Protein backbone atom coordinates (compact mmCIF):
# COMPACT_ATOMS: atom_id res chain seq x y z
CA UNK A 1 0.00 0.00 0.00
CA UNK A 2 1.35 3.40 -0.97
CA UNK A 3 -0.69 5.68 1.28
CA UNK A 4 1.35 7.69 3.74
CA UNK A 5 0.82 7.83 7.45
CA UNK A 6 -1.65 10.55 8.41
CA UNK A 7 -1.13 12.55 11.58
CA UNK A 8 -4.07 14.27 13.24
CA UNK A 9 -4.52 16.38 16.34
CA UNK A 10 -7.11 15.31 18.85
CA UNK A 11 -10.14 17.52 19.18
CA UNK A 12 -9.62 20.09 21.92
CA UNK A 13 -12.10 18.33 24.17
CA UNK A 14 -10.27 14.99 23.86
CA UNK A 15 -7.04 16.33 25.31
CA UNK A 16 -8.88 17.49 28.40
CA UNK A 17 -10.76 14.23 28.62
CA UNK A 18 -7.62 12.12 28.46
CA UNK A 19 -6.16 13.89 31.46
CA UNK A 20 -9.44 13.49 33.31
CA UNK A 21 -9.74 9.79 32.53
CA UNK A 22 -6.16 8.91 33.38
CA UNK A 23 -5.86 10.94 36.56
CA UNK A 24 -9.30 11.50 38.03
CA UNK A 25 -12.22 9.68 36.48
CA UNK A 26 -11.79 6.06 37.43
CA UNK A 27 -11.20 4.98 41.01
CA UNK A 28 -9.78 1.59 40.00
CA UNK A 29 -7.29 1.02 37.17
CA UNK A 30 -8.64 -2.42 36.36
CA UNK A 31 -11.74 -0.76 34.94
CA UNK A 32 -9.84 -0.21 31.68
CA UNK A 33 -10.35 -3.89 30.90
CA UNK A 34 -14.05 -3.66 31.69
CA UNK A 35 -14.35 -0.79 29.20
CA UNK A 36 -12.43 -2.48 26.40
CA UNK A 37 -14.23 -5.80 26.84
CA UNK A 38 -17.56 -3.97 26.89
CA UNK A 39 -16.66 -2.22 23.64
CA UNK A 40 -15.66 -5.52 22.05
CA UNK A 41 -18.91 -7.15 23.15
CA UNK A 42 -20.80 -4.12 21.83
CA UNK A 43 -19.12 -4.47 18.43
CA UNK A 44 -19.97 -8.18 18.32
CA UNK A 45 -23.60 -7.50 19.12
CA UNK A 46 -23.75 -4.80 16.47
CA UNK A 47 -22.46 -7.16 13.80
CA UNK A 48 -24.96 -9.80 14.85
CA UNK A 49 -27.71 -7.21 14.61
CA UNK A 50 -26.72 -5.96 11.16
CA UNK A 51 -26.44 -9.55 9.94
CA UNK A 52 -30.19 -9.88 10.43
CA UNK A 53 -30.65 -7.94 7.19
CA UNK A 54 -27.31 -8.73 5.54
CA UNK A 55 -26.22 -12.35 5.65
CA UNK A 56 -22.78 -11.40 4.34
CA UNK A 57 -22.04 -9.88 7.74
CA UNK A 58 -22.80 -13.08 9.67
CA UNK A 59 -20.54 -13.71 12.65
CA UNK A 60 -18.10 -16.61 12.50
CA UNK A 61 -19.15 -19.57 14.62
CA UNK A 62 -16.22 -19.07 17.02
CA UNK A 63 -16.82 -15.35 17.54
CA UNK A 64 -15.51 -14.27 20.94
CA UNK A 65 -13.53 -11.58 22.69
CA UNK A 66 -9.92 -12.72 23.02
CA UNK A 67 -7.53 -11.27 25.60
CA UNK A 68 -3.86 -12.07 24.91
CA UNK A 69 -1.05 -10.88 27.21
CA UNK A 70 2.56 -10.97 25.95
CA UNK A 71 5.11 -10.49 28.72
CA UNK A 72 8.09 -10.46 26.38
CA UNK A 73 6.67 -7.68 24.21
CA UNK A 74 4.94 -6.04 27.20
CA UNK A 75 1.66 -5.82 25.29
CA UNK A 76 -1.93 -6.71 26.02
CA UNK A 77 -4.20 -7.35 23.03
CA UNK A 78 -8.00 -7.38 23.07
CA UNK A 79 -9.47 -8.78 19.84
CA UNK A 80 -13.00 -9.24 18.58
CA UNK A 81 -14.83 -10.34 15.43
CA UNK A 82 -17.34 -7.54 15.69
CA UNK A 83 -18.58 -4.94 13.27
CA UNK A 84 -15.19 -3.26 13.01
CA UNK A 85 -14.38 0.32 12.03
CA UNK A 86 -13.50 2.07 8.81
CA UNK A 87 -10.94 4.84 8.54
CA UNK A 88 -13.68 7.40 9.08
CA UNK A 89 -15.04 5.48 12.06
CA UNK A 90 -11.62 5.42 13.70
CA UNK A 91 -11.16 9.15 13.23
CA UNK A 92 -14.62 9.99 14.50
CA UNK A 93 -14.90 7.46 17.31
CA UNK A 94 -11.37 7.71 18.69
CA UNK A 95 -10.43 11.21 17.62
CA UNK A 96 -13.40 13.13 18.97
CA UNK A 97 -15.44 12.78 22.10
CA UNK A 98 -18.86 11.09 22.27
CA UNK A 99 -18.87 9.92 18.64
CA UNK A 100 -18.89 6.19 19.21
CA UNK A 101 -21.68 5.52 16.77
CA UNK A 102 -23.83 4.20 19.58
CA UNK A 103 -26.22 7.12 19.35
CA UNK A 104 -26.80 6.65 15.63
CA UNK A 105 -27.05 2.93 16.15
CA UNK A 106 -29.67 3.44 18.86
CA UNK A 107 -31.87 5.14 16.27
CA UNK A 108 -31.58 2.16 13.95
CA UNK A 109 -32.23 -0.08 16.91
CA UNK A 110 -35.45 1.74 17.73
CA UNK A 111 -36.61 1.35 14.15
CA UNK A 112 -35.80 -2.35 14.13
CA UNK A 113 -37.52 -2.89 17.49
CA UNK A 114 -40.65 -1.27 16.09
CA UNK A 115 -40.54 -3.60 13.12
CA UNK A 116 -39.42 -6.84 14.65
CA UNK A 117 -39.83 -6.67 18.40
CA UNK A 118 -37.67 -6.68 21.49
CA UNK A 119 -36.02 -10.01 20.72
CA UNK A 120 -33.95 -8.38 17.97
CA UNK A 121 -32.34 -5.85 20.27
CA UNK A 122 -28.62 -6.36 20.83
CA UNK A 123 -26.98 -5.27 24.06
CA UNK A 124 -25.08 -2.01 23.66
CA UNK A 125 -22.56 -1.07 26.28
CA UNK A 126 -21.59 2.55 26.70
CA UNK A 127 -20.11 5.10 24.38
CA UNK A 128 -16.98 3.69 22.76
CA UNK A 129 -15.26 7.02 22.36
CA UNK A 130 -15.23 7.56 26.12
CA UNK A 131 -14.46 4.24 27.79
CA UNK A 132 -11.74 3.53 25.25
CA UNK A 133 -9.54 6.28 26.67
CA UNK A 134 -9.26 4.42 29.98
CA UNK A 135 -6.64 2.29 28.20
CA UNK A 136 -4.16 5.11 28.77
CA UNK A 137 -4.33 4.49 32.52
CA UNK A 138 -2.17 1.40 31.97
CA UNK A 139 -0.64 1.94 28.52
CA UNK A 140 2.00 4.37 27.20
CA UNK A 141 0.82 3.74 23.65
CA UNK A 142 -2.30 2.21 22.12
CA UNK A 143 -2.78 0.89 18.59
CA UNK A 144 -6.14 -0.10 17.13
CA UNK A 145 -6.27 -2.15 13.94
CA UNK A 146 -9.77 -2.57 12.57
CA UNK A 147 -11.60 -3.78 9.49
CA UNK A 148 -15.23 -2.89 8.97
CA UNK A 149 -17.52 -5.85 8.19
CA UNK A 150 -18.38 -5.74 4.48
CA UNK A 151 -15.13 -3.96 3.57
CA UNK A 152 -11.75 -5.24 2.41
CA UNK A 153 -9.81 -2.33 3.92
CA UNK A 154 -8.20 -2.28 7.33
CA UNK A 155 -6.70 0.70 9.14
CA UNK A 156 -4.52 1.23 12.19
CA UNK A 157 -5.09 4.08 14.62
CA UNK A 158 -2.23 4.78 17.05
CA UNK A 159 -1.58 7.30 19.81
CA UNK A 160 0.40 7.91 22.97
CA UNK A 161 -2.50 9.94 24.35
CA UNK A 162 -0.57 13.20 24.34
CA UNK A 163 -2.40 15.31 21.81
CA UNK A 164 -2.28 13.53 18.46
CA UNK A 165 -2.92 10.24 16.71
CA UNK A 166 -1.95 8.60 13.43
CA UNK A 167 -3.93 6.68 10.84
CA UNK A 168 -2.35 4.31 8.33
CA UNK A 169 -3.48 1.44 6.13
CA UNK A 170 -3.17 -2.04 7.57
CA UNK A 171 -4.18 -5.60 6.88
CA UNK A 172 -6.56 -7.82 8.80
CA UNK A 173 -7.72 -11.17 7.51
CA UNK A 174 -11.26 -10.94 8.92
CA UNK A 175 -13.55 -8.10 10.01
CA UNK A 176 -13.12 -7.04 13.59
CA UNK A 177 -10.76 -5.09 15.81
CA UNK A 178 -7.45 -5.62 17.61
CA UNK A 179 -6.55 -3.20 20.39
CA UNK A 180 -2.90 -3.46 21.44
CA UNK A 181 -1.84 -1.81 24.70
CA UNK A 182 1.88 -1.17 25.18
CA UNK A 183 1.90 -1.42 28.94
CA UNK A 184 3.39 1.03 31.41
CA UNK A 185 6.12 -0.14 33.76
CA UNK A 186 3.77 -0.12 36.74
CA UNK A 187 1.07 -2.18 34.99
CA UNK A 188 2.80 -5.58 34.95
CA UNK A 189 -0.04 -7.21 36.87
CA UNK A 190 -2.25 -6.93 33.77
CA UNK A 191 0.13 -9.16 31.85
CA UNK A 192 -0.67 -12.04 34.21
CA UNK A 193 -3.40 -14.40 33.02
CA UNK A 194 -4.74 -15.03 36.52
CA UNK A 195 -5.15 -11.30 37.13
CA UNK A 196 -6.97 -10.81 33.83
CA UNK A 197 -9.22 -13.75 34.60
CA UNK A 198 -10.12 -12.22 37.96
CA UNK A 199 -11.00 -8.88 36.39
CA UNK A 200 -13.15 -10.43 33.67
CA UNK A 201 -15.06 -12.61 36.12
CA UNK A 202 -15.63 -9.62 38.37
CA UNK A 203 -16.86 -7.19 35.73
CA UNK A 204 -18.02 -9.17 32.70
CA UNK A 205 -18.95 -12.66 33.87
CA UNK A 206 -22.52 -12.32 32.64
CA UNK A 207 -21.92 -10.80 29.21
CA UNK A 208 -23.44 -13.07 26.55
CA UNK A 209 -20.43 -12.85 24.20
CA UNK A 210 -17.79 -15.49 25.09
CA UNK A 211 -14.56 -14.10 26.51
CA UNK A 212 -11.32 -16.09 26.42
CA UNK A 213 -7.80 -15.49 27.74
CA UNK A 214 -4.78 -16.88 25.85
CA UNK A 215 -1.83 -17.83 28.05
CA UNK A 216 1.88 -17.84 27.20
CA UNK A 217 1.64 -21.34 25.70
CA UNK A 218 -1.15 -20.28 23.37
CA UNK A 219 -3.86 -22.12 25.29
CA UNK A 220 -7.22 -20.39 25.54
CA UNK A 221 -9.41 -20.58 28.64
CA UNK A 222 -12.98 -19.34 28.94
CA UNK A 223 -13.10 -16.38 31.32
CA UNK A 224 -16.84 -15.76 31.65
CA UNK A 225 -19.94 -17.85 32.09
CA UNK A 226 -21.91 -15.73 29.65
CA UNK A 227 -25.24 -16.40 31.33
CA UNK A 228 -27.21 -13.77 33.20
CA UNK A 229 -29.50 -15.88 35.38
CA UNK A 230 -31.72 -12.92 36.19
CA UNK A 231 -32.49 -12.43 32.48
CA UNK A 232 -34.04 -15.89 32.19
CA UNK A 233 -37.76 -16.46 32.86
CA UNK A 234 -38.45 -17.63 36.40
CA UNK A 235 -40.11 -20.76 35.01
CA UNK A 236 -36.77 -21.82 33.52
CA UNK A 237 -34.75 -21.44 36.73
CA UNK A 238 -34.52 -24.22 39.29
CA UNK A 239 -34.34 -23.71 43.03
CA UNK A 240 -30.79 -25.04 43.02
CA UNK A 241 -29.77 -22.47 40.41
CA UNK A 242 -31.19 -19.70 42.57
CA UNK A 243 -29.29 -21.05 45.58
CA UNK A 244 -26.03 -21.29 43.65
CA UNK A 245 -26.37 -17.74 42.38
CA UNK A 246 -27.26 -16.48 45.86
CA UNK A 247 -24.09 -18.00 47.28
CA UNK A 248 -22.09 -16.40 44.48
CA UNK A 249 -23.32 -12.86 45.13
CA UNK A 250 -23.48 -13.16 48.94
CA UNK A 251 -20.30 -15.18 49.51
CA UNK A 252 -22.36 -17.11 52.03
CA UNK A 253 -23.00 -20.79 52.69
CA UNK A 254 -26.62 -20.64 53.77
CA UNK A 255 -29.77 -20.74 51.67
CA UNK A 256 -31.85 -17.66 50.89
CA UNK A 257 -34.73 -16.99 53.26
CA UNK A 258 -36.51 -15.05 50.51
CA UNK A 259 -35.92 -14.78 46.76
CA UNK A 260 -37.30 -11.83 44.80
CA UNK A 261 -37.11 -12.07 41.01
CA UNK A 262 -39.10 -9.65 38.89
CA UNK A 263 -39.10 -7.56 35.75
CA UNK A 264 -40.24 -3.94 35.95
CA UNK A 265 -41.70 -2.67 32.70
CA UNK A 266 -43.19 0.59 31.55
CA UNK A 267 -41.63 4.03 31.81
CA UNK A 268 -38.74 2.48 33.76
CA UNK A 269 -37.43 -0.97 32.85
CA UNK A 270 -35.13 -3.14 34.91
CA UNK A 271 -34.77 -6.67 36.22
CA UNK A 272 -34.15 -7.46 39.87
CA UNK A 273 -32.94 -10.68 41.46
CA UNK A 274 -32.56 -10.16 45.20
CA UNK A 275 -32.06 -12.47 48.16
CA UNK A 276 -32.65 -12.15 51.89
CA UNK A 277 -30.23 -14.46 53.76
CA UNK A 278 -31.37 -17.04 56.28
CA UNK A 279 -28.33 -16.47 58.51
CA UNK A 280 -26.43 -13.51 59.89
CA UNK A 281 -23.11 -12.80 58.17
CA UNK A 282 -19.98 -13.75 60.06
CA UNK A 283 -18.69 -10.18 60.02
CA UNK A 284 -20.67 -7.55 61.97
CA UNK A 285 -23.00 -5.58 59.72
CA UNK A 286 -21.84 -2.36 61.36
CA UNK A 287 -18.42 -2.65 59.68
CA UNK A 288 -19.76 -1.53 56.29
CA UNK A 289 -23.21 0.03 56.38
CA UNK A 290 -23.69 0.42 52.63
CA UNK A 291 -25.87 -1.77 50.44
CA UNK A 292 -23.84 -4.01 48.13
CA UNK A 293 -26.54 -4.94 45.61
CA UNK A 294 -24.81 -5.12 42.22
CA UNK A 295 -25.76 -2.74 39.43
CA UNK A 296 -25.54 -4.13 35.90
CA UNK A 297 -26.32 -2.35 32.66
CA UNK A 298 -27.21 -4.74 29.84
CA UNK A 299 -25.55 -7.56 31.81
CA UNK A 300 -22.29 -5.67 32.33
CA UNK A 301 -21.38 -5.30 36.01
CA UNK A 302 -20.92 -1.61 36.76
CA UNK A 303 -20.56 -1.29 40.53
CA UNK A 304 -21.72 -2.65 43.87
CA UNK A 305 -21.50 0.86 45.36
CA UNK A 306 -24.55 2.40 43.67
CA UNK A 307 -26.46 2.04 46.97
CA UNK A 308 -29.49 0.59 45.23
CA UNK A 309 -31.01 -0.12 48.62
CA UNK A 310 -30.86 2.05 51.75
CA UNK A 311 -28.39 1.22 54.51
CA UNK A 312 -31.12 -0.35 56.64
CA UNK A 313 -31.65 -3.03 53.96
CA UNK A 314 -27.94 -3.75 53.52
CA UNK A 315 -28.46 -7.41 54.42
CA UNK A 316 -30.15 -7.94 51.02
CA UNK A 317 -27.92 -9.34 48.24
CA UNK A 318 -28.43 -9.58 44.53
CA UNK A 319 -28.45 -7.87 41.16
CA UNK A 320 -30.36 -5.08 39.45
CA UNK A 321 -29.92 -4.93 35.67
CA UNK A 322 -31.28 -2.14 33.47
CA UNK A 323 -31.13 -0.97 29.88
CA UNK A 324 -32.21 2.54 30.85
CA UNK A 325 -28.90 3.89 32.15
CA UNK A 326 -26.31 5.46 29.85
CA UNK A 327 -22.72 4.36 30.32
CA UNK A 328 -20.82 7.53 29.64
CA UNK A 329 -17.73 9.18 31.08
CA UNK A 330 -18.48 8.76 34.72
CA UNK A 331 -19.71 5.32 35.56
CA UNK A 332 -18.67 5.96 39.15
CA UNK A 333 -21.08 8.91 39.27
CA UNK A 334 -24.20 7.03 38.19
CA UNK A 335 -25.64 7.52 41.66
CA UNK A 336 -26.74 11.04 40.82
CA UNK A 337 -28.80 10.20 37.75
CA UNK A 338 -32.61 10.57 38.06
CA UNK A 339 -33.11 7.14 36.50
CA UNK A 340 -31.07 5.45 39.19
CA UNK A 341 -32.95 7.33 41.89
CA UNK A 342 -36.21 5.98 40.47
CA UNK A 343 -34.78 2.46 40.38
CA UNK A 344 -33.71 2.80 44.02
CA UNK A 345 -37.23 3.78 45.08
CA UNK A 346 -38.80 0.96 43.09
CA UNK A 347 -36.40 -1.70 44.41
CA UNK A 348 -36.80 -0.52 48.02
CA UNK A 349 -40.59 -0.62 47.70
CA UNK A 350 -40.41 -4.16 46.31
CA UNK A 351 -38.33 -5.40 49.25
CA UNK A 352 -40.57 -3.68 51.82
CA UNK A 353 -43.67 -5.19 50.22
CA UNK A 354 -42.11 -8.66 50.37
CA UNK A 355 -41.20 -8.27 54.04
CA UNK A 356 -44.65 -6.88 54.82
CA UNK A 357 -46.34 -9.83 53.15
CA UNK A 358 -44.22 -12.32 55.07
CA UNK A 359 -44.69 -10.48 58.36
CA UNK A 360 -48.48 -10.84 58.02
CA UNK A 361 -48.37 -14.57 57.26
CA UNK A 362 -49.48 -16.00 60.61
CA UNK A 363 -48.88 -19.57 59.43
CA UNK A 364 -45.18 -18.79 59.06
CA UNK A 365 -44.80 -16.43 62.01
CA UNK A 366 -41.84 -18.36 63.41
CA UNK A 367 -39.96 -18.02 60.12
CA UNK A 368 -40.43 -14.26 60.17
CA UNK A 369 -39.38 -14.09 63.82
CA UNK A 370 -36.17 -15.91 62.92
CA UNK A 371 -35.55 -13.40 60.14
CA UNK A 372 -36.10 -10.58 62.61
CA UNK A 373 -33.71 -12.07 65.14
CA UNK A 374 -31.07 -12.04 62.41
CA UNK A 375 -31.70 -8.64 60.86
CA UNK A 376 -34.12 -6.75 63.10
CA UNK A 377 -31.49 -4.39 64.52
CA UNK A 378 -30.55 -3.33 60.99
CA UNK A 379 -34.18 -2.89 59.97
CA UNK A 380 -34.76 -0.62 62.98
CA UNK A 381 -32.13 1.76 61.66
CA UNK A 382 -34.63 2.68 58.97
CA UNK A 383 -36.93 4.26 61.56
CA UNK A 384 -34.09 6.54 62.61
CA UNK A 385 -32.69 7.28 59.14
CA UNK A 386 -35.57 7.14 56.66
CA UNK A 387 -38.36 9.60 57.43
CA UNK A 388 -40.22 8.75 54.22
CA UNK A 389 -40.39 5.02 55.01
CA UNK A 390 -40.97 5.02 58.79
CA UNK A 391 -44.66 4.23 58.57
CA UNK A 392 -43.89 1.24 56.33
CA UNK A 393 -41.05 -0.07 58.48
CA UNK A 394 -42.76 0.16 61.89
CA UNK A 395 -45.22 -2.76 61.36
CA UNK A 396 -42.29 -4.97 60.31
CA UNK A 397 -40.62 -4.70 63.72
CA UNK A 398 -40.91 -7.35 66.42
CA UNK A 399 -40.38 -6.99 70.18
CA UNK A 400 -40.14 -8.88 73.42
CA UNK A 401 -42.78 -7.80 75.91
CA UNK A 402 -43.38 -7.69 79.66
CA UNK A 403 -46.62 -9.68 79.27
CA UNK A 404 -46.18 -11.81 76.12
CA UNK A 405 -44.02 -14.91 76.09
CA UNK A 406 -42.77 -14.61 72.51
CA UNK A 407 -42.47 -11.81 70.00
CA UNK A 408 -45.07 -9.16 69.34
CA UNK A 409 -45.59 -6.29 66.91
CA UNK A 410 -46.77 -2.71 67.27
CA UNK A 411 -50.20 -3.46 65.70
CA UNK A 412 -50.67 -6.35 68.14
CA UNK A 413 -49.62 -4.18 71.08
CA UNK A 414 -52.09 -1.44 70.16
CA UNK A 415 -54.88 -4.00 69.87
CA UNK A 416 -54.21 -5.13 73.48
CA UNK A 417 -53.98 -1.67 75.06
CA UNK A 418 -56.24 -0.94 78.01
CA UNK A 419 -59.06 1.54 77.33
CA UNK A 420 -57.55 4.10 79.72
CA UNK A 421 -54.01 3.65 78.36
CA UNK A 422 -52.76 6.60 76.35
CA UNK A 423 -49.28 5.55 75.20
CA UNK A 424 -47.21 2.66 73.89
CA UNK A 425 -44.70 2.01 76.66
CA UNK A 426 -41.19 0.70 76.18
CA UNK A 427 -38.04 0.20 78.22
CA UNK A 428 -34.49 0.09 76.86
CA UNK A 429 -31.53 -1.73 78.41
CA UNK A 430 -28.53 -3.74 77.32
CA UNK A 431 -30.10 -7.20 77.60
CA UNK A 432 -33.53 -8.79 77.87
CA UNK A 433 -32.95 -10.40 81.28
CA UNK A 434 -32.07 -7.04 82.81
CA UNK A 435 -35.23 -5.63 81.29
CA UNK A 436 -37.45 -8.38 82.69
CA UNK A 437 -36.13 -7.78 86.21
CA UNK A 438 -36.09 -3.99 86.04
CA UNK A 439 -37.65 -2.00 88.87
CA UNK A 440 -39.00 0.31 86.17
CA UNK A 441 -41.62 -2.33 85.32
CA UNK A 442 -43.07 -2.94 88.80
CA UNK A 443 -45.91 -0.45 88.63
CA UNK A 444 -46.78 -1.43 85.07
CA UNK A 445 -46.87 -5.12 85.96
CA UNK A 446 -49.07 -4.44 88.97
CA UNK A 447 -51.56 -2.76 86.63
CA UNK A 448 -51.05 -5.28 83.82
CA UNK A 449 -49.91 -2.55 81.45
CA UNK A 450 -47.76 -4.07 78.72
CA UNK A 451 -44.25 -2.69 78.16
CA UNK A 452 -42.10 -3.42 75.11
CA UNK A 453 -38.61 -4.59 76.06
CA UNK A 454 -35.89 -3.22 73.79
CA UNK A 455 -32.32 -4.48 74.01
CA UNK A 456 -30.75 -3.88 70.59
CA UNK A 457 -27.98 -1.32 70.17
CA UNK A 458 -30.21 0.96 68.07
CA UNK A 459 -33.19 0.91 70.43
CA UNK A 460 -32.16 4.03 72.31
CA UNK A 461 -32.42 6.05 69.10
CA UNK A 462 -35.41 5.12 66.95
CA UNK A 463 -38.52 5.36 69.26
CA UNK A 464 -38.19 9.11 69.59
CA UNK A 465 -37.86 9.42 65.81
CA UNK A 466 -40.98 7.33 65.18
CA UNK A 467 -42.86 9.39 67.76
CA UNK A 468 -46.18 7.59 67.48
CA UNK A 469 -47.85 4.60 65.90
CA UNK A 470 -51.53 4.57 64.94
CA UNK A 471 -51.85 7.91 66.78
CA UNK A 472 -50.50 6.38 70.01
CA UNK A 473 -47.35 8.12 71.31
CA UNK A 474 -44.33 5.99 72.16
CA UNK A 475 -43.13 6.72 75.69
CA UNK A 476 -40.22 5.36 77.68
CA UNK A 477 -41.29 4.17 81.13
CA UNK A 478 -38.34 6.13 82.49
CA UNK A 479 -39.96 9.35 81.25
CA UNK A 480 -42.92 9.43 83.62
CA UNK A 481 -46.09 7.46 84.34
CA UNK A 482 -49.03 9.61 83.26
CA UNK A 483 -51.30 6.65 82.61
CA UNK A 484 -50.59 4.89 85.91
CA UNK A 485 -52.61 7.39 87.92
CA UNK A 486 -55.66 6.34 85.93
CA UNK A 487 -55.04 2.62 86.43
CA UNK A 488 -55.28 0.99 89.82
CA UNK A 489 -53.09 -2.01 90.61
CA UNK A 490 -54.98 -5.28 90.64
CA UNK A 491 -55.69 -6.38 94.24
CA UNK A 492 -54.58 -3.02 95.65
CA UNK A 493 -55.19 -2.59 99.41
CA UNK A 494 -56.65 0.51 100.99
CA UNK A 495 -53.40 1.23 102.84
CA UNK A 496 -52.50 4.89 102.42
CA UNK A 497 -48.95 5.95 101.72
CA UNK A 498 -47.38 7.95 104.56
CA UNK A 499 -46.39 11.57 104.06
CA UNK A 500 -42.67 11.89 103.39
CA UNK A 501 -42.23 15.64 103.14
CA UNK A 502 -39.33 15.76 105.61
CA UNK A 503 -37.42 12.92 103.92
CA UNK A 504 -38.04 14.30 100.42
CA UNK A 505 -36.70 17.71 101.47
CA UNK A 506 -33.62 16.14 103.09
CA UNK A 507 -32.84 14.01 100.04
CA UNK A 508 -33.20 16.95 97.67
CA UNK A 509 -30.76 18.99 99.73
CA UNK A 510 -28.26 16.15 100.02
CA UNK A 511 -28.31 15.12 96.35
CA UNK A 512 -28.15 18.46 94.58
CA UNK A 513 -27.02 18.81 91.78
CA UNK A 514 -26.93 15.08 90.96
CA UNK A 515 -30.73 14.92 90.78
CA UNK A 516 -33.19 17.53 89.57
CA UNK A 517 -35.95 16.41 91.93
CA UNK A 518 -36.96 13.84 94.54
CA UNK A 519 -40.56 12.67 94.70
CA UNK A 520 -42.69 9.80 95.88
CA UNK A 521 -44.10 7.42 93.30
CA UNK A 522 -46.82 4.81 93.03
CA UNK A 523 -45.06 2.88 90.24
CA UNK A 524 -42.83 0.86 92.59
CA UNK A 525 -43.88 -2.31 94.40
CA UNK A 526 -40.84 -4.20 95.68
CA UNK A 527 -38.04 -1.70 95.10
CA UNK A 528 -37.20 1.29 97.27
CA UNK A 529 -36.05 3.72 94.59
CA UNK A 530 -35.96 4.24 90.85
CA UNK A 531 -34.67 6.91 88.48
CA UNK A 532 -36.81 8.79 85.98
CA UNK A 533 -36.46 11.67 83.55
CA UNK A 534 -38.61 14.72 83.10
CA UNK A 535 -40.10 13.42 79.86
CA UNK A 536 -38.78 16.34 77.84
CA UNK A 537 -35.37 14.93 76.87
CA UNK A 538 -33.62 11.62 76.14
CA UNK A 539 -34.54 8.64 78.28
CA UNK A 540 -32.07 7.12 80.73
CA UNK A 541 -30.58 4.62 78.27
CA UNK A 542 -29.87 7.33 75.72
CA UNK A 543 -28.23 9.46 78.41
CA UNK A 544 -26.01 6.51 79.37
CA UNK A 545 -25.00 5.97 75.74
CA UNK A 546 -24.12 9.63 75.36
CA UNK A 547 -21.94 9.51 78.48
CA UNK A 548 -20.19 6.34 77.32
CA UNK A 549 -19.46 8.00 73.99
CA UNK A 550 -17.87 10.91 75.82
CA UNK A 551 -20.47 13.33 74.53
CA UNK A 552 -22.05 14.08 77.89
CA UNK A 553 -25.62 15.21 78.30
CA UNK A 554 -26.60 18.84 78.58
CA UNK A 555 -30.15 18.31 79.86
CA UNK A 556 -31.48 18.20 83.39
CA UNK A 557 -30.31 15.67 85.96
CA UNK A 558 -32.52 12.61 86.61
CA UNK A 559 -35.37 12.48 89.08
CA UNK A 560 -35.09 10.16 92.09
CA UNK A 561 -38.42 8.49 92.85
CA UNK A 562 -38.92 6.78 96.22
CA UNK A 563 -41.43 4.12 97.25
CA UNK A 564 -43.36 5.46 100.29
CA UNK A 565 -44.51 1.93 101.23
CA UNK A 566 -41.02 0.38 101.31
CA UNK A 567 -39.59 -0.46 104.75
CA UNK A 568 -36.24 1.20 103.99
CA UNK A 569 -37.89 4.47 102.95
CA UNK A 570 -40.16 4.48 106.03
CA UNK A 571 -37.14 3.92 108.25
CA UNK A 572 -35.22 6.76 106.63
CA UNK A 573 -38.28 9.01 106.98
CA UNK A 574 -38.40 8.37 110.72
CA UNK A 575 -34.71 9.25 111.01
CA UNK A 576 -35.22 12.40 108.93
CA UNK A 577 -38.08 13.50 111.19
CA UNK A 578 -35.78 12.87 114.16
CA UNK A 579 -33.30 15.33 112.66
CA UNK A 580 -30.55 12.89 111.63
CA UNK A 581 -28.09 13.78 108.88
CA UNK A 582 -28.89 11.46 105.93
CA UNK A 583 -26.35 12.73 103.41
CA UNK A 584 -24.46 9.42 103.22
CA UNK A 585 -27.68 7.41 103.00
CA UNK A 586 -28.98 9.72 100.28
CA UNK A 587 -25.88 9.06 98.17
CA UNK A 588 -26.29 5.32 98.66
CA UNK A 589 -29.96 5.49 97.56
CA UNK A 590 -28.99 7.31 94.36
CA UNK A 591 -26.23 4.82 93.59
CA UNK A 592 -28.64 1.96 94.31
CA UNK A 593 -31.06 3.39 91.75
CA UNK A 594 -28.26 3.74 89.21
CA UNK A 595 -27.12 0.13 89.70
CA UNK A 596 -30.71 -1.11 89.32
CA UNK A 597 -30.82 0.55 85.90
CA UNK A 598 -27.58 -1.04 84.72
CA UNK A 599 -25.45 2.01 85.38
CA UNK A 600 -22.41 2.36 87.63
CA UNK A 601 -22.34 4.11 91.03
CA UNK A 602 -20.98 7.65 91.00
CA UNK A 603 -18.24 6.49 93.39
CA UNK A 604 -17.95 2.68 93.25
CA UNK A 605 -15.59 2.51 96.25
CA UNK A 606 -17.86 4.58 98.49
CA UNK A 607 -20.87 2.54 97.36
CA UNK A 608 -19.08 -0.73 98.15
CA UNK A 609 -18.19 0.54 101.64
CA UNK A 610 -21.78 1.59 102.29
CA UNK A 611 -23.10 -1.82 101.27
CA UNK A 612 -20.45 -3.56 103.38
CA UNK A 613 -21.38 -1.41 106.39
CA UNK A 614 -25.06 -2.22 105.92
CA UNK A 615 -24.29 -5.93 105.68
CA UNK A 616 -22.09 -5.71 108.78
CA UNK A 617 -24.94 -4.09 110.71
CA UNK A 618 -27.29 -6.85 109.64
CA UNK A 619 -24.78 -9.53 110.58
CA UNK A 620 -24.33 -7.99 114.05
CA UNK A 621 -28.02 -8.41 114.90
CA UNK A 622 -29.00 -11.42 117.01
CA UNK A 623 -30.70 -14.22 115.13
CA UNK A 624 -34.45 -13.71 114.97
CA UNK A 625 -34.29 -9.99 115.79
CA UNK A 626 -36.25 -7.52 113.71
UniProtKB/Swiss-Prot annotation:
- Which locations, inside or outside the cell, does it occupy? Cytoplasm
The answer to whether keyword Transcription applies is no
Q: Residue ranges of region C? A: 545-626
Say which domain of life the source belongs to.
Answer: Bacteria
GO CC annotation terms, alphabetical: cytoplasm
CDD domains (UniProt xref)? HATPase_Hsp90-like (cd16927)
UniProt-annotated stretches for the region B:
332-544
Region feature A, mapped onto this chain: 1-331
Q: Which InterPro entries match?
A: HATPase_C_sf, Heat_shock_protein_90_CS, HSP90_C, Hsp90_fam, Hsp90_N, Ribosomal_Su5_D2-typ_SF
Q: Which family does it belong to?
A: Belongs to the heat shock protein 90 family.
Question: Subunit comment for this entry?
Answer: Homodimer.
Q: Which PANTHER family match?
A: HEAT SHOCK PROTEIN 90 FAMILY MEMBER
Designated name of the protein: Chaperone protein HtpG
**Which organism does this record belong to?**
Methylorubrum extorquens (strain CM4 / NCIMB 13688) (Methylobacterium extorquens)
Q: Which gene encodes it?
A: htpG
Amino acid sequence: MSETVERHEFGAEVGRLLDLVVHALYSDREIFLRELVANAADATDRRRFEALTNEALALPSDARVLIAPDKAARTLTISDAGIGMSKEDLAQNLGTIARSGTRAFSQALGERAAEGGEDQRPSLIGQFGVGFYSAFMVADRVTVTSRRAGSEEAWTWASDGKGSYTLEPASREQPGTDIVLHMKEDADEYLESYRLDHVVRKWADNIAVPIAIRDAEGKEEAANRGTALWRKPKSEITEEQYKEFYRTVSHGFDEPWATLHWRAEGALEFTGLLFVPSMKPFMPMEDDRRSKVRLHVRRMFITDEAELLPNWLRFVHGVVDTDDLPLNVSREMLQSTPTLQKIRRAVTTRVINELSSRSKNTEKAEEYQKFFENFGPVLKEGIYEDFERRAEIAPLLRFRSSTEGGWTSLPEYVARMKPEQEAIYYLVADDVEALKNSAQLEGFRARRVEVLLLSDHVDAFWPEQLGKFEDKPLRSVTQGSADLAKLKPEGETAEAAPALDTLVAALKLALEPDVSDVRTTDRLVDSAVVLATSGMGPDLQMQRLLRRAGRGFGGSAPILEINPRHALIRSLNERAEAGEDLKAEAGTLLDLARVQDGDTPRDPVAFARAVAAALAGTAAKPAGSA
